[in-house]
Regions:
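Carbohydrate-associated surface elements
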Residues: 86
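Short beta-strand-loop/turn "lid" adjacent to the catalytic site in phosphate-handling enzymes
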Residues: 29, 51-83, 109-114, 144-168, ...
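Short clusters of small/polar residues that mark proteolytic maturation junctions
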Residues: 15-16, 82, 243, 266
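Active-site core segments that coordinate phosphate-bearing ligands/cofactors
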Residues: 90, 95-110, 118-152, 164-175, ...
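A conserved helix-loop-beta module that forms one wall/lid of the active-site cleft
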Residues: 178-196
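Proline-centered turn/helix-capping motifs that create local helix->coil transitions or kinks
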Residues: 8, 185-186, 329-331
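N-terminal glycine/serine-rich phosphate-binding loop of ATP-dependent small-molecule kinases
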Residues: 1-79, 105, 132, 179, ...
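Short, basic and Ser/Thr-rich N-terminal targeting/leader segments
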Residues: 1, 55, 62-64, 116, ...
Length: 433
């Protein structure tokens, strides 16, 4: 819940509830969630705030990007949520190459597994789409439909771009390229570049949903150029706001608003690398002692010691960890690695520090690509995500590697904050329904 005061936003109340919506599946690569359960929880949360704060006039929306749900002609959800983590696009097809590779070869378009359009193409080929489905959208766009009674999705360009096959320069889907791989335009949702009104819910205006990346940036850093946002949670991401459109291997130009772009680099593992390390040590402790307790406090102590010890070593004697344990968006088959192992650095402290450093270096390499290609001079660096808030050593490593002071975002729920403020960007109350 945000209260807008001039150009500032004051956080009145934040509320977090468990998602717990993943559906069991026989396929390790399949990551799907119960869409209706998500919608019910979101509605209950919204109703709570509207009951508590009846003065609310507008409702802004955001949610997880890239994933899709299918809807029927009445605007009802008829499928699970296929999430951004879904791996069907990386599976070998009959021609022994993955769908992602085929898209690159046939369409010269780079799209990762988990992107909505990749998921849709796979589902279409494998007859996995419900017969009554007439289109698809993100889960937050469906929530907007649910609240306002819309029968057809209207999605902001920030979400459309997350599907893949989207021309960020001209703010439209690449219909010619989609045609090369057999996708008809009838499946595509309507796209808008500016905030629009979807309709109303309980007499409040509901605005178009925005991507969680854009919402997080807006909530944490505002809309100033030359600002770098570093987010580390289960994943890892850097975002720089720019007037320039710039896209390279591993770097996306995601639509923002007012003609700006978020230049984004994302690591697939990110904070998960640290979680894997904690899980590794926890299994060892459980095997030795029978105890199964979180070890993040101990890891922080070891990371601190590892950092101090590492500072006194020669560069060629420092243990190095590459944390691409889940591959990269550009190359899903890339593996992680541990190098520069010597007898004197074969320690849990060095491993712990090495994982944290590896997480940061992967993001820093992406930042270097952006800086070299755009000549952007970053003057402010904002940090967000629990991976940073709960790990002072990681924050120090980021400052040292990037060479910029790190300021933690004022509010923890950056995406929700940005979504709430985004509703104030609506310039017209004309119905788009």
């Amino acid at each position: 819940m945000e209260h807008n005061i001039g150009n500032n936003a004051e956080l009145i109340e934040a509320k977090t509830i468990a998602n717990d919506s993943f559906l069991p599946t026989a396929n390790d690569w399949e990551k799907i969630q119960d869409a209706e359960q998500i919608i019910k929880k979101a509605k209950d949360l919204l109703d709570y705030f509207l009951d508590q704060y009846p003065e609310v006039k507008r409702i802004g929306l955001t949610g997880q990007m890239h994933g899709i749900v299918y809807v029927d002609k009445a605007g009802r959800c008829v499928s699970p949520l296929y999430t951004w983590q879904d791996g069907r696009g990386s599976l070998p097809e009959d021609n022994s190459i993955s769908l992602v590779e085929e898209i690159q070869q046939k369409c010269q378009v780079k799209a990762a597994s988990g992107y909505g359009m990749v998921t849709h193409i796979y589902n279409l080929r494998h007859y996995l789409i419900p017969d009554v489905a007439v289109g698809f959208c993100t889960i937050m766009d469906y929530f907007g439909m649910y609240l306002t009674g819309r029968k057809r999705a209207l999605i902001h360009a920030s979400n459309a771009a997350g599907f893949g096959f989207f021309d960020g320069r001209h703010m439209c889907f690449m219909k010619e390229e989609l045609g090369k791989i057999g996708i008809q335009g009838k499946w595509l949702p309507e796209v808008c570049g500016a905030m629009q009104e979807l309709g109303t819910y309980r007499n409040r205006i509901v605005t178009t949903a925005i991507g969680d990346n854009q919402a997080s940036f807006f909530g944490a850093a505002g809309n100033e150029n030359s600002t770098l946002l570093v987010n580390i949670g289960t994943g890892g991401q850097i975002s720089v706001l720019s007037d320039q459109y710039f896209a390279e291997d591993g770097i996306e130009a995601r639509p923002f608003w007012d003609g700006k772009y978020l230049l984004v680099g994302a690591s697939l593992c990110g904070g998960k690398a640290y979680a894997l390390l904690e899980e590794f040590f926890r299994k060892l402790i459980k095997q030795a002692t029978g105890q199964d307790k979180p070890l993040y406090g101990i890891l922080e102590t070891m990371a601190r010691k590892g950092k101090e010890t590492n500072a006194s070593r020669l560069e060629n004697r420092k243990l190095k960890v590459t944390t691409t344990f889940n591959g990269t968006r550009a190359n899903p088959e890339t593996s992680g690695s541990i190098t520069n192992l010597f007898a004197d650095n074969f320690t849990p402290e060095a491993f712990t520090y090495g994982v944290l450093e590896g997480m940061v270096l992967e993001l820093y390499q992406m930042y270097q690509i952006i800086r070299t290609g755009t000549y952007i001079q970053v003057t402010r660096m904002i940090g967000s995500g629990n991976g940073l808030r709960k790990n002072p050593v990681l924050c120090e490593i980021i400052e040292e590697i990037f060479g910029i002071k790190l300021i933690l975002a004022e509010y923890e729920e950056e995406a929700a904050t940005g979504a709430a403020i985004s509703s104030t960007l609506l310039k017209s109350i004309e119905r788009t329904k």
